[in-house]
């Protein structure tokens, strides 16, 4: 059996972890721009001190991330993001808890710090979320003990190296961009609809002389003028937002690409963690369950490949085989 870390080493920050948190910092800084602009504008319109309000808004937004790592909020977020996630039933808990305890004993970690969850899916899978959530699918519970422990050792590796914490913080700080992107898209749709309405109304006003009364003609012209103003205003707003939004969107896309690359590196790091605990051969067996399906699906290319969060199972098996220690 490989050397076991001491009980005090429940967390281990790696280069991958540092890279992930660096991306979180970048996303946080960019999110401050998205938060600051409307805060400044709203304060200016309300007659308040814009700079003070903007600073307070940015500080509140920064501090809000502390909510994400609170255990009750973490559990609620996990349920929100994974609809079929639930607490383990007594029989399931009797299956997971001893397996996790054996893995944590090898790793020198405290099994009591983790929130165990079961996902209702008919495939072998598991994931770690935030600082505490550790979930397995119902089908994963049907694995033999050594394979289930290998899956848990992999997810424990993510938690020990803080990967899920960085991912959930990055997700949280990306929310303003998601809201801003939806707003820009909505403005574009409304502007296009107004432009089409303006065109149809312009065609109709061509027949104003054909029997329409002066009052009706005047009303149509006023409506046409109003629509024209709205179309121009919407177009200007779309252009201005595009000029402001495009650099931010490009930086966010770059951050997502880098984050995906680090996520793939994190998977290899979690595999190494499991292998160092002696679960390398068992983890290879688990990954082998996905090889046939993986080979039948076309490999992603272009941006899809860059945004892929997991390396291929074949690549992971080869990496574990090259570096795995002897043992269980």
Model-assigned labels for residue ranges:
Residues 2-6, 188-282, 287:
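Metalloprotease/metallohydrolase-associated module, dominated by Zn2+-dependent proteases
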Residues 50-83, 101, 247, 251-259:
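Transmembrane alpha-helices and immediately adjacent membrane-cytoplasm interface residues
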Residues 1-67:
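N-terminal low-structure segments adjacent to metalloprotease catalytic domains
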Residues 156-175, 280:
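Catalytic Zn2+-binding segment of zinc metalloproteases
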Residues 82-97, 255-273, 308-311:
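Active-site metal-coordination segments of metallo-dependent hydrolases
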Residues 107-131, 257-261, 274-328:
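Active-site-proximal gating segments in proteases and membrane effectors
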Residues 70-165, 296-298:
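Peri-catalytic and regulatory segments of divalent metal-dependent proteins
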Residues 25-40, 175-182, 219-231:
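Canonical alpha-helical transmembrane segments of integral membrane proteins
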